[in-house]
């Protein structure tokens, strides 16, 4: 029988049939991820990718377009809700998901890709670098204002990281 490392993985766009599994993956990380109601997942299913292995979903990632006021040709895109089943950590699932979402995003020519994360080394290995949150506040404000975990984006311990891809 094949092990988790030997079983073929499939990263693909999410479908409506994946919504409940996506919800469960995100819900498994209450300290690390903002909750996403299942209705939000369904409404944004076209902005989710999933990783399936051994007949089940083992990871998910989504993205959000952050338009720049007065510069519609230079939006940033935020990677959100990256969640990998704990049994599949350190097996390349997160790297595959982020790589797939970057490839998809790159085709739209955004100015940069943003991630707010507790996993700085993971994103550094993918080419991201840390920036002060103040540099991104106008872009992430809409998400941060609805956060139920922290009083202010400046008290949130997440690290702001960007991948510059314009050029």
Model-derived features with residue positions:
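A short beta-loop-alpha structural element at the N-terminal edge
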Residues: 8-22
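Hydrophobic adenine-recognition pocket in adenosine-nucleotide-binding enzymes
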Residues: 14, 82-84
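Helix-loop element at the rim of GNAT/NAT acetyltransferase active sites that forms part
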Residues: 25-36
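A conserved beta-strand-loop-helix scaffold within acyl/acetyltransferase catalytic domains
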Residues: 36-47, 53, 60-76, 80-82
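Conserved acetyl-CoA-binding loop-helix of GNAT-fold acetyltransferases
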Residues: 84, 90-103, 115
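Conserved GNAT acetyl-CoA-binding A-motif
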Residues: 105-118
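Conserved active-site alpha-helix within GNAT-family acetyltransferase domains
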Residues: 117-143
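C-terminal "cap" of GNAT-fold acetyltransferases
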Residues: 136-167
């Amino acid at each position: 029988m094949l092990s988790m490392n030997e079983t073929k993985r499939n990263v693909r766009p999410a479908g409506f049939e994946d919504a409940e599994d996506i919800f469960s993956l995100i819900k498994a990380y209450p300290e690390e991820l903002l909750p996403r109601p299942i209705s939000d997942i369904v409404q944004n299913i076209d902005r989710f990718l999933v990783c399936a292995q051994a007949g089940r979903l083992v990871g998910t990632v989504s993205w959000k377009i952050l338009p720049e006021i007065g510069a519609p040709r230079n939006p940033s895109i935020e990677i959100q809700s990256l969640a990998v089943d704990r049994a599949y950590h350190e097996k390349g699932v997160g790297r595959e998901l982020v790589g797939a979402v970057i490839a998809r995003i790159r085709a739209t020519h955004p100015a940069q890709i943003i991630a707010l994360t507790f996993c700085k080394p993971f994103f550094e290995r993918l080419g991201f670098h840390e920036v002060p949150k103040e540099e991104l506040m106008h872009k992430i404000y809409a998400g941060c204002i609805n956060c139920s975990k922290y009083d202010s984006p400046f008290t949130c311990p997440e690290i702001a990281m960007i991948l510059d891809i314009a050029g």
